[in-house]
Amino acid sequence: MPKSAAMPFFHRHTLVLAGLTGAAAALLPSWARSGAALARGARISADFDPVAAIWLGYDAGHEAFTADLATALWPHVPIRMLVRDAEAEGLARAVLQGRGLDADKVRFVHDARAPFFVRDAVVFGLDGARQPFVVDFRWTYYGWTNWCRRTFRGKQPRPESCARADGLDTGSLDRRLGDALGLATFQSALAIEGGGVEVNGQGLLIANAELWSSRNRNMGRAAMEREMLRLPGIRKVIWLPRGLAHDTLHRGTITGAYVGWGTGGHTDEFVRFADARTVLLAWVDEAEAASHPVARINLQRMQANFDILSASSDADGQPLRVIKVPLPRTIERPVVLSADADTAYSNQWTAAVFPAREGRREGDTVIQVATSSYLNHVLANDLVLLPDYVGQGTPPERQQQVKAIYEAVFPGRKVRFIDTINANWVGGGAHCATLTEPAGIP
């Protein structure tokens, strides 16, 4: 399907977004364009709201994960897929059909910038008439420019050369999707990804201060909060200092020889609303914290977050209930730094990805820690989909404890587990690889 198509069109439940020109957008009804007024009572939707559909991405390196996600979600919610082009759609169809799923029941959307971790590119809301809309945040490719400047200061290539690879076209994907689906768009001056937006749907936003600051380097906290309070439905912000230590910003050092690959602190790794006043918080096994340096840092950080949340209230002044959810046992593997490394792969690293001041050399061995957390769960109507870490060394009794917590806070929902480890090695997970479209009124 040609990238230069003047208007989006449907074919076998397929919609093409790439190439939606300004002239074409002008032909859309006024309520479908960016800046359209939202009905009174608009709000960013909460993850625990009823779900109209779950969107998935496609990437050849994650085919098995996509198949597992689609198979688990299929009985509970309609599936839609955001893929780069017709070729990717064909491959995705084959993956679904290989699991016995009817790909003709899936709505495919094409966009040349479609990411695999679709959660981060688009944020949905519901207006007062319960019609979905899109919140258009600025896109920084997970703070890539700042990471480049920090990492390559004093090195070649220069920071500016690295930063030119931002792929900022992804930042307009949410607007293109909103326009093509006939949805209004609310534009924000803030930069963030969907995995860093945690709301209760009733006025409260939980923000990781370190994360939001890394994406909005030219804004102080007061300025950011003013913009947050302009977001649809947001009346109060709770600031938490930091996220999980092993969710580093891109590839980076955690402590000593321990390194990670992550987002720099997405809230969907460590703090999630179960309902409007119940907050799930990642927690560390204290025995593990006593013996493992990464677990020790995580315990310190989560204790600080717990203290803040326990003393906080929702937007209406009601106290929050904070429930500690055990983290899986720390998952790690040794990696030898090599100048010949193909860094497209999660298990290949080079000394060049670290700041010069750290003094790392090719041939050094580092210990990569996976970005693992049960809180990177997916809610899909009557289903709770959790990561499965027993095969990665987490004691079965700990995972059963996690299951019991989820069954208690999500009564009436089935709790199922899925292997997410390959996504965890690159800073993602099941929640990152899914995008929740809230149920509105048809």
Model feature map: region roles:
Residues 31-442:
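Histidine/cysteine-enriched polar flanking segments
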Residues 14-33:
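N-terminal export signals
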Residues 1-10, 24-25:
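N-terminal secretory signal peptides
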Residues 4-5, 13-14, 133, 388:
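Residue-level marker of intrinsically disordered, low-complexity segments enriched
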